[in-house]
């Protein structure tokens, strides 16, 4: 079972809001996650990002691989 850190879409139509989640790589985009690790709101100025670094580090130690977008969010907020 490969674990990924990726975004899952929330919010309403044309007002996206994303949660950063740890999820099985075979699960659909909005499927049931293993853990919530933060959120990303691109619709406000400035862009709002909150990441629980302890949870992210825990999942990275367990072998989770971040998606490209999550990787760039982690780099910007470190």
Swiss-Prot record:
GO terms for molecular function: structural constituent of ribosome. The keyword Ribosomal protein applies. PANTHER family: 30S RIBOSOMAL PROTEIN S16, SMALL RIBOSOMAL SUBUNIT PROTEIN BS16M. Transmembrane segments: none annotated. This is Small ribosomal subunit protein bS16. One of its GO terms (cellular component) is small ribosomal subunit. Belongs to the bacterial ribosomal protein bS16 family. InterPro entries: Ribosomal_bS16, Ribosomal_bS16_dom_sf. The lineage of its organism: Bacteria, Pseudomonadati, Thermodesulfobacteriota, Desulfovibrionia, Desulfovibrionales. Disulfide bonds: none annotated. Keywords: Ribonucleoprotein, Ribosomal protein. One of its GO terms (biological process) is translation. It comes from Maridesulfovibrio salexigens (strain ATCC 14822 / DSM 2638 / NCIMB 8403 / VKM B-1763) (Desulfovibrio salexigens). Pfam families: Ribosomal_S16.
């Amino acid at each position: 079972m490969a674990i990924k850190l990726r975004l899952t879409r929330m919010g309403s139509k044309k007002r996206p809001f994303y949660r950063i989640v740890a999820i099985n790589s075979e699960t659909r985009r909005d499927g049931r996650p293993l853990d919530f690790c933060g959120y990303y709101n691109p619709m406000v100025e400035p862009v709002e990002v909150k990441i629980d670094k302890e949870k992210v580090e825990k999942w990275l130690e367990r072998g989770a691989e971040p998606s490209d977008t999550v990787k760039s969010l982690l780099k910007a907020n470190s």
